[in-house]
Amino acid sequence: FLKKPIDTFYQRRLQVRFEAVEEDDTDNENFDLNGLDRWRLDNELIQEGVVKAASEEELHERLEATLDRMARRGDLGMGVTEHRLRTELAGRLPDLFQRYRGALTEWPEAVAEPLPFECRYSDSTGAVEVVDLIDNLRCNPSGQLCRLVIANAGLLTGSGYSKKVRYANLLRDWLIHLAGQLSGQPFETVILGKEEGRKFHFPVMAPEQAQKHFEAILGRWMEATTRTLPIHCEAGFAWITSFYGGKKFIGDHERAISEAEQAYSTALDRDTGYLLGAFESPEALMASGEFEALLHQLYVPLWEAEQGKSAAEQIGSME
């Protein structure tokens, strides 16, 4: 829902699913990985190598064995292509392995059992009960808890100094983090990015603050099954990072709107039908005036946790 709020109404209420149509390229038979294949192989290498290896030597042995298995399955193509993909897939894993081992040193003891979570919420739209188990928990010698995970997807986009955080790929772990603060055993969250040297951290929160954010998400999720909410993830974070984190453009409302509209226009270009069916233009998305209220409810708390700062204080510091 948080990643694709507009899709929720179509899929849950109308039972409509638009599928992306891929055209066969009959003139070009060069082997390469699509995004989903690369994600699958990436995570197989991480689970079989980074997570299970106890030393650098064992890491390289495990990576080679896993890559050989992928090659036998035909996942890596042949010849020069296979060599290139082996290098691309395994190249950044030694850095990730070192960071993972460092985190294990800080949080040495794995929690044997997952942490149960249960939450009931109701409003004028209806009622919902959320029940789940939270895993990947570890503790330090002081008994403090941490959920330590390696990111499933890339957490940065762009290159060089223009790199930006892909907040959409932090949403799942953020939601689990909020839930954990309500479990009676609050924990911090550490997410190791696949990108070199990158780590994201969510600190322990006051239960009442986490409950406010969690219930706001549940309430909007239920509402999203009754109508298309005028909010879009990438557009929302484009507004937030411009208005609250735009350095020399901080507090510039017109620029924030422009950044959000540009992000939504980009999303429309690759839309399979959901966005065009609901809000066919950036102007249509903004027309009701709800966009900014929704992004403050659904997305600003994540930005604040990742940045370690208050959005309101960012604006207050200018006064």
List each model region and its residues.
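Structural signature of nuclease core domains in nucleic-acid processing machines
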Residues: 1-319
